[in-house]
């Protein structure tokens, strides 16, 4: 297991906030985010080495993968939780507009 994955898993285990489903989903999303950061070339990261360039790279990747706006916003919420837990909440912009993430659209334009 990679160091970042392990550290984020332990962070989730020590910070038991929310329902069991929320805790499980958060842990899975953080594992996914850690794997994506590794694939993007950010190796040897620790839980405290989160920087704006990492977040911008992740958001760009998610837009390139054509993920839905709701999925991106949910992942940003998990990143904000991570940043708050390691006392780096100023690293993540407070608004999704900073990253170019538009508002959710609840009516589909067409079929996926």
Task: Label every model-predicted segment.
Residues 6-110:
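N-terminal core-binding DNA-recognition domain of tyrosine recombinases/integrases
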């Amino acid at each position: 297991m990679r160091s970042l994955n392990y550290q984020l898993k332990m962070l989730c285990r020590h910070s038991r906030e929310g329902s069991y489903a929320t805790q499980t989903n958060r842990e899975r999303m953080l594992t996914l985010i850690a794997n994506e950061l590794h694939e993007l070339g950010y190796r040897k990261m620790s839980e405290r080495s989160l920087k704006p360039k990492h977040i911008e790279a992740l958001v760009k990747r998610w837009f390139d993968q054509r993920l839905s706006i709701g999925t991106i916003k949910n992942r940003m919420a998990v990143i904000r939780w991570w940043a708050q837990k390691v006392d780096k909440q100023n690293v993540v912009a407070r608004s999704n507009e900073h990253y170019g993430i538009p508002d959710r659209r609840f009516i589909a334009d067409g079929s996926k």
